[in-house]
């Protein structure tokens, strides 16, 4: 399957809101209360919020497409790291999601590779992220890319505070 990866623009805000909400719901609906999931989606995946993030100079969205169909996305966020993240200039992968029809096609690997390339090109020495401790599929994916656990943090979905593992890997 062929696909392209490009930087998203503010014109992609509605598309990213819909894709983000769908992929988050697909990944976490079975393990969260419907009201918590609905609250999280409403507060994190509106077109207005996506547009605000797209215009933020500290954020960069990478959008993977196959024949013009959105297949997945990643959000790189240049922000202060969680405690325990090493390096002088770490960069966060805040989101990396692949739409269910594209699981197993290489889209996730291509997005990760592009995230690493972008981080290196911008002079970052470490890349880090948070992953839910119960998301074994994602944890296995990140382990294959050389990420190791460096800490933990709390991620709130609605009224449910969950434990996320903080993972990092050097870019050298």
Please report, for each region that a protein language model flagged, where it lies by residue:
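Acetyl-CoA-dependent GNAT
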Residues: 3, 7-13, 17-31, 35-103, ...
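Alpha-helical segments flanking ligand/cofactor-binding loops in enzyme cores
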Residues: 14, 139-140
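Conserved catalytic-core motifs of GNAT/GCN5-like acyltransferases
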Residues: 81, 128-131, 143, 148-165
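Short amphipathic helical patch at the helix-1/turn junction of helix-turn-helix
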Residues: 98, 132-133
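Conserved short alpha-helix immediately C-terminal to the canonical SAM/SAH-binding motif I
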Residues: 111, 135-138
